[in-house]
C-alpha cells in the first residue's frame, strides 16, 4: 500500500523518512527540473540588483515562477494520485497540502488520547470514521484545571462508548502478556472478555516463575517525600529496593542469556522525581552497565503504547493518611500493569494503597 506522510519530517523516525511528503517530492522525476528553475530564479534575483534592464529580468523571473508553480502542482497531483493512505496527526490534517481533499475513510489511532476538538479537524474531510483506542487507558493531557472541569478531557471516543455502545467493538484476543498478568485487567476493566492468545498464554522467562510479584514495602521504612508540583513525589528507599530487585532478577536469568536474548526491562513510576532518581541509581551502579540499552525508565504516561519482557512498578505513595493522589485514576494503573509480557513486579506500601478499592 502506497503511504504518504504529511507533517514535520524532523519528527519522523528514520525508518519512515522515505514515506514523507518532502522525500517523495524530492524523489519525483520532475523535481530536478523544478530545482533548476528555482536556482535560475535565485540567480536572476542576484543579477537584478546591479542590472540596468531590471524590468526584463523581472519578467523572466515571473515566467519562471509560473513554470515552477505548474511543476509543483503536477508533482503534488502525482503524489496524491499514487498514495492510497495519507498519514498525519490530527492537527496536521489542516495542512495546506490537504486543502480541498476528500477521503472515504478516516482512521484515528489512539483515539482515547485525542482531544475531541482535534478530531473534528480531519472528520470534516471524510465520509466515514473509525476510532481505534482504549478509553480504559490514559486520556489526553489537559493541564488547565478550568478546561478540564469544562469537559475538555472528555474524548470523542468516550462520548461514543457512552451514547452509542452498539457501534463499539472490543478486540478480545491479546498477543502481549502472560494470562496471569492479563487476568486482573481483563476482569476489572473489560468484563472478563479479553483472552490471551495460545502462544502467549503461559509465556515466561524462568521455569516455574510467578508472572506477578507484589513486594510490600510497609515494614521497610519506605517513606514518600513531596518535591514540588512539577516532579511530584519521591520514595528513595523504594527506588533503591526496586533497583535491588531488578539486579536480583537479572542475576537469576543469567548475564549471558539476558544479553543474548535481549530481554528488555521497563522501570515505571507515576512520578517524575522517582523516575529521575531511578535513572541516577542505574547510572551509578556498574552492575547495570552491560544492560543499560535494554532498560528503560519512564513515567506511566511515557510508557503508554509500549511493552517490555519485564516490568517493575514503583508506586511511591506511603503515608499514614492513605493518600494515593492520581494513583486513584484507574486508567493510569491499567496502563502500568499491562506493559509486561512475561514478568510484572510491583513495589508499594500495602497499608497506604489498600485504602482505595482498586
PLM feature segments, named:
Residues 6-10, 14, 20, 30, ...:
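Conserved helicase motor core of SF1/SF2 NTP-dependent helicases
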Residues 17-104:
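Conserved helicase NTPase catalytic core signature
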Amino acid at each position: 500500500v502506497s503511504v504518504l506522510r504529511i507533517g514535520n519530517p524532523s519528527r519522523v523516525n528514520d525508518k519512515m523518512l522515505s514515506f514523507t511528503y518532502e522525500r517523495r517530492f524530492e524523489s519525483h522525476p520532475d523535481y530536478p527540473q523544478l530545482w533548476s528553475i528555482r536556482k535560475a530564479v535565485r540567480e536572476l534575483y542576484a543579477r537584478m540588483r546591479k542590472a540596468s534592464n531590471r524590468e526584463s529580468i523581472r519578467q523572466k523571473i515571473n515566467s519562471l515562477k509560473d513554470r515552477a508553480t505548474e511543476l509543483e502542482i503536477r508533482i503534488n497531483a502525482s503524489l496524491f494520485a499514487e498514495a492510497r493512505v495519507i498519514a498525519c496527526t490530527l492537527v496536521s490534517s489542516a495542512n495546506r497540502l490537504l486543502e480541498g481533499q476528500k477521503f472515504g475513510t478516516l482512521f484515528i489511532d489512539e483515539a482515547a488520547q485525542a482531544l475531541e476538538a482535534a478530531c473534528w479537524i480531519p472528520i470534516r474531510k471524510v465520509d466515514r470514521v473509525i476510532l481505534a483506542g482504549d478509553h480504559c487507558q490514559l486520556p489526553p493531557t489537559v493541564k488547565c484545571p478550568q478546561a478540564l472541569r469544562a469537559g475538555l478531557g472528555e474524548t470523542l471516543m468516550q462520548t461514543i462508548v457512552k451514547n452509542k455502545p452498539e457501534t463499539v467493538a472490543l478486540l478480545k484476543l491479546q498477543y502481549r502478556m502472560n494470562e496471569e498478568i492479563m487476568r486482573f485487567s481483563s476482569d476489572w476493566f473489560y468484563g472478563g472478555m479479553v483472552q490471551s492468545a495460545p502462544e502467549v498464554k503461559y509465556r515466561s522467562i524462568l521455569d516455574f516463575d510467578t508472572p506477578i510479584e507484589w513486594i510490600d514495602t510497609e515494614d521497610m521504612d519506605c517513606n514518600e517525600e513531596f518535591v514540588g508540583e512539577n516532579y511530584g513525589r519521591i520514595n528513595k528507599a523504594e527506588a533503591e529496593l526496586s533497583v535491588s530487585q531488578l539486579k536480583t532478577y537479572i542475576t537469576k536469568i543469567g548475564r549471558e542469556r539476558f544479553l543474548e536474548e535481549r530481554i528488555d526491562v521497563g522501570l515505571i513510576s507515576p512520578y517524575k522525581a522517582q523516575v529521575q532518581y531511578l535513572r541516577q541509581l542505574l547510572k551509578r551502579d556498574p552492575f547495570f552497565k552491560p544492560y543499560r540499552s535494554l532498560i528503560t525508565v519512564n513515567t506511566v504516561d511515557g510508557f503508554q503504547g509500549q511493552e517490555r519482557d519485564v516490568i517493575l512498578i514503583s508506586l511511591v505513595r506511603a503515608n499514614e493518611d492513605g493518600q494515593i493522589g492520581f494513583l486513584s485514576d484507574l486508567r493510569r494503573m491499567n496502563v502500568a500493569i499491562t506493559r509486561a509480557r512475561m514478568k510484572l513486579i510491583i513495589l508499594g506500601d500495602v497499608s497506604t494503597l489498600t485504602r482505595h478499592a482498586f
